[in-house]
Amino acid sequence: MEVYCHFKVDTGMGRIGFSVRSDFEAAIAAMERCAALPKLHFSGIFQHFAVADSTTPENEAYTQAQHALFERTVQRLQADGVALHTIHCANSAAQMRHPEWHHSLTRAGIILYGLDPSPEVHFDGLRPTMTLKSVVEFVKDLLPGESVSYGRTYTANTPRKVATVCVGYADGYPRALSGSNGNPNAGVMSIRGKPAPIIGRVCMDQTLVDVTDIPDVKMNDEVTVFGPENAAIGADTADSIAAKTGTINYEIICGISRRVPRVYLRDGAPVRIWNDLEET
């Protein structure tokens, strides 16, 4: 069997690859031995930046050093007769901040979702593309003194109207967004264009929200769990959820589980629906 592949070099990420930063000559020799194997066909080379999404002087210097070492590696292999047709190193942050490093191709990640790579790196013109939606499955009145969900972390002080939404941590919605009395980091969804704050703990398949101030909420109403600010009035965004839960926006969008159907839109109209439960 013949295998077509690219070299992966470690210039400072410290994850995988030929470690050109530890012993340059040994790494070059190892790659050239691999390139001589008859069943392996190396047509490209790549590396990954560790801190391209940081603008501090120290981290910018580290990123520059990574790229310089990568170029040195490429030039040496080419000088030794190794044909490298595809050269790539730029992730989302490097792609936007250093267009001179695009080489043969770039590896866009978070910017495909229209999100910034980090809080300190902002690109004008990006528009968030992903919205997580669900529906109301139950509406009820909550009397003063009554509690909801596991742990009884929320108890009504006044009469409230509560909606149960079909989404939970098994869908990738963080349990850390659970609402208790006075929790400032509770999640917020949007129903009928108005904010619906979470009350009680997020369950595996369901989450409860306060809809007291939203008139006429009923079963099967559409719920925006999170999405772009202009499309989800009052609801969390991927960035705000990341801030509330102490993580990054990457984890929020990548964490949506396989059981959530994906609806792909073009000009606002669905062009494909992918449902893993039906596909398998």
Model-based region annotation:
Residues 1-4, 11-143, 215, 273:
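Active-site loop/helix belt of alpha/beta enzymes
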Residues 9-11, 256:
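Generic hydrophobic/packing signal
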Residues 143-280:
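C-terminal accessory subdomain/extension
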